[in-house]
Amino acid sequence: MAEMMGGITGWFVADKIVAYLFIVLFIWGASNKFGKKGEFNDDFTSLDNMKSLQGFAALGVILHHISQEYFFQEEGVLSLFVNAGAYFVALFFFCSGYGLIKSLDTKKDYLKGFIGKRVVKSLVIPFYVNVILYGLMMFIVKWPLEPLQWVTNFLGITMMNRYAWFPIVLAILYVVFYLHFSNIKNRKICFVAIGIFIICLGIHTCICGHVAWWAGPDNWWMDDNFWETDFKWWMDEQIFWFNGEWWANSAPAFLTGLIFANYEKKIVAFFKKKYALKLHILIVITLLLGMLNNYGQAEFGYWTEWEGNGPAIGDKIVTYFTQIPLLFVFPLLVFVIMMKYHVSNPVSRFFGKYSLHTYLMNLAAITMCRFIEVPDALVMVGDVKNNLFIFAIAVIVLSVLLGMLEHKITTAVQNLIYRKPAPVAVATYVRPSLLEADGEHTTKTSLAAEIKSDDVADKKAEEKKDRS
């Protein structure tokens, strides 16, 4: 027994407890139709449930970013979330694609003013508000940036916040959606064209790699001497757009959302017949695609620059193509499950409301809290693992607070730019119909009729008197 328990530490248990608590969130406020034959959740794609799902995804992304910190990986804490980021982001992309088609089908002239409302107001303004906030924080703490980098960061050409890639990619996909659906009537052609664009976007990230591999001699990023003598700031990791596979590897889910929304009735009707059998088949397919993805990651991989064979773009592209099917199908599996089981609780709704902003401010929170994480820092809370626990809690809380602040600032900027002109008051008289007349109006008109009748009678009496 002692030997069996020898590998189990307090932090092993704590790690599992964190995973358990995250799972508990999927039970609290659940609507469960499993075990009830022929019964389904008719509201599984409602706005409230979509927002709750995005809330879970936002919290998952925060935990994913925390789990990727060096000491967390060393200690194996939050290991469940290390490679889960792409799945959480895929849910965001799916919901975005789904919402576009539903809005297109239900809102009159939806594409009129689309770029201004859905791209500039909803994505570009939040992005640049975030750029300014990060710039102010970097200026306050005297973050060492080259003068040119300050300029390119504020312009958005290079990344002030390396986590802020999502609104950029989503804005690009929105523009692509608008260009296709405003000019092409055949939706199938639109879906195919958007799918091709998404694949090309992923290939482009594979070509870009993680560093400016094209800017120096072969494998310069592995040469310590080059870093000390010839390295320029713009050659570093994640400086330019698309420096990283995460920019596009989850984007196929956007296409899934478009297609699901367009054929929702047919898809739902299909899965309602023999639901249990089809759900299990879909689960098996997803697991097989997961194995294909794992094979691609293990045999080829995205981080090929550090194998000493140059950027190895071909290996990246192969890895990308082994991942596309999984991230296309995974959101479908989630929503087929939601036909029978979905969750909405205060935590999920809260994170759903602030999902974009907690995500955008997450890097700032992580950076501010790193003094807790590093064991040889001046400020010590306890041993390394105690520090990691406090670090994780602090990052979540600070991400929420900073996200709420950014949301408030962004909303104020949006209202300032897009405020509607005050309505001009025009005094007009509208003659109500008899059916619209209320009691007061009826009384007034009756009284006026009586006064007018009396006046006519008096006038006739006076005329009669004059004649006589």
List each model region and its residues:
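Membrane-interfacial loop-to-transmembrane-helix junctions in polytopic alpha-helical membrane proteins
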Residues: 7, 42-49, 74-81, 234-244, ...
